């Protein structure tokens, strides 16, 4: 009897060890971030969320492409990359993009210009030249050409200019495919922050700053698209009390300093861009998804959804309970320390 018990115990031990040897870990998401950082502070919050996902091994951040013009934007993202401990993430910038220089306080420039009492830059940089960063559509082609088929998720939380230019691009040193062919082959999903589906008379900012580009992307992008519309992020506000009280450990923090520079404190800010990033990283568990269909952009910049089983466009919705849960989740992520600062 004892012999049988010993044999059973050994068998169970082997089974447990064998089970532990099987990894249930999901593969990290290959993500490209597309942002108009420097316009609204929610881009900086969205970047924080992405860096924490990189720290956790949930994301490979292949690159950050910027659709707001000006050297301060690229330099600010370089500061973020460096501060969060990911200095080698490639950057792509835009030239001759949407005219948005006077649309808001440029918190990116405010942080770039910050100095210590000794007159030195307040934040470290990695790049030596912020004027000659690669053009975003070229970086897209380089990154997509090197990626596995249907492996890349793009989170676009600004204007559609870079994505439109990518679709229009031709063969180059990185790929013989056209831009549209390259996207169709390599991209799994595009997640955007754009539009408004509760009120068709609303002309949402990310759309109206480049209406032709938004039209092209929503109507011609060859993979599934999920968009987080204005009405979702407007229900979920990041609290000023968190900015004021939850970062005492950090000293100078480039996201916190940007938040303080963007508007007169204290203010709570809508989380339009973080909601799109959250869906790109964690999927629909926090949201309700619309049915499948088509999204068209009017000449004035309205976004119109038409249901259809053959459509590949969907948009996010949230009720009050979901909004509260997402807000708490954002606070938990954003107030946590980056891996390089624990």
Which stretches of residues belong to each language-model region?
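N-terminal acidic, glycine/proline-rich low-complexity segments
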Residues: 21-342
